[in-house]
Structure formats: structure tokens, C-alpha cells
Regions:
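Catalytic-loop motifs flanking and including active-site residues across diverse enzymes
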Residues: 65-68, 87-91, 135
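Amphipathic, small/basic residue-rich leader segments at the start of a protein or domain
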Residues: 1-82
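Residue-level signal for alpha-helical context at structural boundaries
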Residues: 34, 38, 90-91, 109
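Predominant activation on well-ordered alpha-helical scaffold segments within soluble catalytic domains
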Residues: 17, 70-74, 89-96, 105
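Short, surface-exposed linear patches
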Residues: 26-27, 43, 74-77, 95, ...
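N-terminal glycine-rich flavin-associated loop
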Residues: 31, 83-100
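FAD-binding core of flavoproteins
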Residues: 93, 101-167
Length: 167
């Protein structure tokens, strides 16, 4: 059994290692706080085709495997890139499984859309505990027995951080 990366996988790893070395210096990571997101970096990242990795080719994506996404995530993590790639990849794949190859999902391959999942079912009011929720344009959520796709402009501001509050 050969566990080495294929040539295509090695090319993905090399591409994103170089991309993040060039595009994500420490100063850029620091400037992305407290939101933890850099919109300009996301647009550059999307230009590589990475935002469409969770989508089939028919929707403008590349239909790559989770292993390919893991290689991108490893490169992203190595530079602490302030991007919601894993959230977007997982949500994109799940949306395709739920909705099929609906053309409305093609927007997720572009530089302006970010998808994510609500971690808990919505009982009333807005969804809570949504990774990348402050920047996501598409949120997949469960409400009772229905799966909902919520699309609206993200708030663009972080939730209050109570970690440093006095007890």
C-alpha cells in the first residue's frame, strides 16, 4: 500500500504552501483580529479555486476530496491564516448533499460567499454558536425537522469575548 501523496496532491500542497508563505505574513494575521478574518486574503484565496473545492465541477468547483482539503488546511494552519476554509468546505459539501447540484450553490465557488454550519438546532430567534458566523453569507441550520439555508449579509463584527471578563 502506497501512502505517498499523488502528483496532484503534491501540487496542491506546494501551491498552498507557497501561497500562504507569500500572502499571509504575521502582520496580516495580527491585523485580522479580533474578527479573525481577512476579506482581501479570502478573495485572493478564492482566485486559486480553493473556495470551490467542496463543490462539483458543474457548479464551478473542483470537486476535490477531503484529503485535498486537508492539505490546504495544513498549509493554512501552518501560517495561521485568518480564513474560514474548513467551515466553508464542509458546509459546501453538505449543501450539495442536501440540495443536489442546484445552480444557486454556484455562488459558493466565488470570492464573495462564505458558507458555514450552525452547530445547534435553531429553536427560536437567531442561530447561536456558528463558526465564522460573523463573516458567513450562507448558514446551513437545522430548525425542528427542516434543514434551512439562511442567506443574508453577515454582521461583519465579532461576538463579544467574555473570556477576559472578571469573575
Amino acid at each position: 500500500m502506497d501512502l505517498a501523496l499523488s502528483q496532484d496532491q503534491q501540487a496542491i500542497e506546494d501551491l498552498f504552501t507557497t501561497f500562504f508563505e507569500n500572502e499571509c505574513p504575521t502582520e496580516r494575521v495580527r491585523k485580522a483580529e479580533p474578527l479573525g478574518f481577512d476579506a482581501d486574503l479570502w478573495e485572493r484565496f478564492a482566485e486559486t479555486g480553493a473556495s470551490g473545492m467542496g463543490l462539483p465541477e458543474s457548479l464551478g468547483g473542483s470537486g476535490t476530496s477531503p484529503l485535498d482539503a486537508a492539505l490546504v488546511a495544513e498549509s493554512l494552519g501552518r501560517r495561521l491564516a485568518p480564513l474560514p476554509f474548513i467551515e466553508h468546505f464542509v458546509a459546501s459539501r453538505l449543501l450539495v448533499r442536501c440540495m443536489g447540484e442546484d445552480p444557486v450553490l454556484g455562488v459558493l465557488a466565488g470570492p464573495k460567499a462564505i458558507a458555514t454550519l450552525a452547530l445547534h438546532p435553531i429553536t427560536r430567534g437567531p442561530a447561536h454558536l456558528v463558526p465564522a458566523g460573523a463573516v458567513a453569507s450562507h448558514v446551513l441550520a437545522l430548525a425542528k425537522s427542516e434543514v434551512l439555508l439562511c442567506t443574508e449579509d453577515p454582521p461583519g463584527r465579532p461576538a463579544a469575548n467574555f473570556a477576559a471578563s472578571p469573575l
